[in-house]
Amino acid sequence: MWLKSLTLKHFRNYQDAEINFHSGLNIFLGQNAQGKTNILESIYFLALTRSHRTRSDKDFIHFQEKDLKVSGILEKKTGTIPLDIELTAKGRITKINHLKQNRLSDYIGAMNVVLFAPEDLQLIKGSPSLRRKFIDIELGQIKPIYLADLSNYNHVLKQRNSYLKNSQNIDENFLSVLDEQLIEYGCRVVKHRLDFLKKLEIFAQEKHLDISQKKETLTIDYLSSVPLQDIDSIEESFRLSLSKNRKRDLFKQNTGVGPHRDDIAFFINQMDANYGSQGQHRSVVLSLKLAEIKLIENITKESPILLLDDVMSELDNDRQLKLLETISQEIQTFITTTTLEHLKNLPKDIKIFEISNGNIK
């Protein structure tokens, strides 16, 4: 798939803009704070209805405006697909082929993107929430039912935590009803995640062996807050964990176990990658990003769109080369950069946009 054109109305520092893209490599060149990343963010937003930079919808909207609209024309093997997202006072409106989508899980997945930004380099040493977010975003694109199950789980979790925090007299029977709902959706979430990581690991191992010149083997472990000796007994294990933690939950007024507390661990030659070098961290993250591309291609039979937000300068020549090899394999790619000096071995057929104070040339 590739994004043929993008139209922005009241998005960040773009009052009105329309851009036609190359089906291969597109480079946004300009100094910092000119609007390069805003364009990548708008493409990411068009695909996933969210930003990789902020949680607040208000941050998207152009100064002194009250709404925004991002539209794109997507080319896929099945044909041309118009996509639209609007943010208004009434909320968020998503459309595919000009038809309104009632649920986010109906919209997300129409356009698949893989983002590689400097903050992704914190994936290894950063907080568990970063790694859970990584799973949620990538898995949600290729398995919409995961988003529905995760949304239901988070709804019950919020309800349970609110009840623990605000009720003067806890009804143990009502809490048990909430527990059963939490178990139902929580088990689905964990099973989706385990299946995803198993598939991702296969491609990531292959990429990491190539990057490390066959010196390092990468493995990925899912660290569950609920014991996972047997996937078939996960429901009973979750139920037992909630029962054991009930006194703790009542005292702390929150839920101590479940997929919202889970984590991922990465190992290089069976040693925790958290203790590896900065170069090894970069190799692991690069392997994961390249593996995401292969996994999405394998499942959807379409290439995702690759977004590289000022990340090339973070990679040495060897890692840049591995990334550029992927770009040359007919994957539409968007790169933001302040200079072309560190971009070597680029394909000849590219499109360069010069960005200055929100103006595109």
UniProtKB/Swiss-Prot annotation:
InterPro entries: DNA-binding_RecF, DNA-binding_RecF_CS, P-loop_NTPase, RecF/RecN/SMC_N, RecF_2. ATP binds at residues 30-37. GO terms for biological process: DNA replication; DNA synthesis involved in DNA repair; double-strand break repair; SOS response. GO terms for molecular function: ATP binding; single-stranded DNA binding. Keywords: ATP-binding, Cytoplasm, DNA damage, DNA repair, DNA replication, DNA-binding, Nucleotide-binding, SOS response. The RecF protein is involved in DNA metabolism; it is required for DNA replication and normal SOS inducibility. RecF binds preferentially to single-stranded, linear DNA. It also seems to bind ATP. This is DNA replication and repair protein RecF. The lineage of its organism: Bacteria, Bacillati, Bacillota, Bacilli, Lactobacillales.
